């Protein structure tokens, strides 16, 4: 395993937190919090621009995506009064997939050493990368020594065989390369890739919730992130390529109107609330493709029907991901809903009924001293990136090397959870 170290805290490094989403591109420039300050970071500057060139988190127009990143970074640099070189990048593309598996090493009755732990991790990396997918994240769930289970740290203990249950998050290689390339064209060095669902979950949950078991749903414009923690361990981090924009597309198609009008209608009366009293209220809108200003109207009940159909389909896909990850209904105690799309009226109630769990809205945790203007579910992922980068409680290390392009992706397996 390559040499690793925790981020240095005595001389705070300057780092960018970059979230290139379907609807918006956000860049925070941060430094490790000074001694005596609450929270993991001091925010030096913030930049945000509408995204272009992405679809469901995937880069489809390189030049357009690059210009958005450049604009967001420049805005953050002006606010911070410094030039940004290194970024931590959130990833929602590449068909993120969670895998849980076991690795073991024979040690013939002696005490477990660091070298044995490294062998286990190396075996885990080889296993998940065998089909050419890139490893983004890997965390240990628990260790076993022979027949003894539930061991948090086996080092120094004797056994014939040491084994570990691992959870890994992988992604298709090409979409990751394209995302990294966008940042590199903006003269940024990508020092780490973090699964976006994992980051947003860290940003809106407490350690106590993650210990008790929690599911986090991050409803974005083009994707919906799913993360599950059980007993404090990440057990699922996946992305469904469906988000708020798909509701707008459905409204535009179903009502035969423009996408702009569909967005207006969604904001005005989009809901999944059942039993509303005004489902027959007419909603006027402009027809698409007509010569002259022709209008039509639809009942709010029709709007709700279109919205609800898409929301039901999305949650069916989320349920399939949970089943594929072997996460049963009793694994989590509650659901946390976050992301800009999570503010759709009635969505939290629908989620609670669908999963049979209590639900709360997830906002960036105030305890971390986040700027008041950024205390919105839309910035949950960025706050999670801050914890990954600087908070020792997040337990993440990064390689001493800075990787670029394919070199980063070939070596990303070295940047792993410190809980090993």
Regions found by a protein language model. Give the residues of each.
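Nucleotide/phosphate-binding catalytic cleft detector across ATP-hydrolyzing
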Residues: 1-24, 28-215, 233-235, 244, ...
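Short glycine/serine/threonine-rich phosphate/pyrophosphate-binding segments
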Residues: 25, 201-202, 212, 221-227, ...
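Acidic-glycine-rich active-site phosphate/pyrophosphate-binding loop
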Residues: 42, 219-223, 227, 351-366
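Glycine-rich beta-strand-to-loop/alpha-helix junction loops that act as flexible
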Residues: 89-94, 333-343
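Short glycine/threonine-rich loop-to-helix capping motif typified by GTGT followed
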Residues: 206-208, 340-354, 375
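Glycine-rich phosphate-binding loop of actin/hexokinase-like ATP-binding domains
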Residues: 212-254
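A general structural motif
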Residues: 310-319
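Hydrophobic, well-ordered secondary-structure elements that form the walls
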Residues: 318, 337, 385
């Amino acid at each position: 395993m390559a040499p690793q170290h925790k981020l240095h805290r005595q001389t705070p490094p300057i780092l960018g937190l970059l979230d290139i989403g379907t609807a918006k591109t956000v860049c925070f420039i941060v430094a490790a919090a000074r001694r005596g300050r609450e929270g993991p970071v001091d925010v030096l500057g913030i930049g945000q621009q509408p995204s272009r060139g992405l679809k469901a988190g995937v880069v489809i127009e390189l030049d357009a995506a690059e210009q958005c990143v450049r604009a967001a970074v420049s805005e953050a640099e002006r606010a911070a009064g410094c030039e940004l070189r290194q970024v931590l990048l959130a990833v929602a593309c590449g068909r993120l997939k969670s895998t849980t598996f076991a690795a073991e090493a024979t040690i013939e009755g002696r005490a477990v050493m660091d070298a044995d732990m490294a062998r286990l991790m190396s075996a885990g990396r080889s296993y998940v990368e065998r089909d050419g997918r890139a490893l983004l994240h890997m965390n240990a769930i628990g260790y076993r020594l022979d027949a003894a289970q539930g061991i948090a740290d086996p080092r120094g203990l004797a056994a014939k065989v040491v084994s570990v249950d691992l959870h890994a998050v992988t992604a298709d290689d090409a979409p990751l390369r394209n995302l990294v390339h966008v940042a590199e064209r903006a003269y940024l060095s990508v020092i780490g890739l973090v699964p976006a669902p994992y980051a947003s979950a860290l940003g809106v949950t407490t350690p106590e919730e993650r210990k008790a078991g929690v599911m986090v749903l991050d409803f974005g414009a083009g994707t919906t992130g799913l993360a599950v923690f059980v007993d404090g361990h990440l057990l699922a981090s996946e992305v469904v390529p469906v988000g708020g924009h798909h509701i707008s597309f459905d409204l535009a198609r179903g009502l035969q109107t423009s996408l702009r009008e569909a967005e207006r209608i969604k904001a005005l009366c989009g809901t999944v609330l059942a039993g509303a009293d005004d489902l027959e209220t007419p909603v006027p809108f402009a027809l698409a493709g007509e010569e002259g200003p022709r209008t039509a109207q639809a009942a709010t009940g029709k709007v709700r029907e279109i919205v609800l159909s898409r929301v039901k389909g999305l949650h069916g896909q989320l349920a399939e991901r949970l089943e594929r990850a072997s996460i049963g209904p009793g694994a989590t105690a509650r659901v946390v809903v976050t992301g800009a799309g999570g503010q759709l009226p009635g969505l939290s109630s629908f989620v609670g009924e669908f999963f049979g769990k209590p639900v709360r809205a997830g906002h960036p945790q105030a305890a971390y001293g986040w700027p008041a203007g950024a205390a919105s579910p839309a910035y949950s992922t960025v706050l999670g990136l801050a914890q990954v980068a600087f908070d020792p409680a997040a337990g993440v290390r990064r390689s001493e090397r800075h990787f670029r392009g394919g070199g980063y992706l070939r070596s990303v397996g070295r940047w792993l959870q410190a809980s090993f």
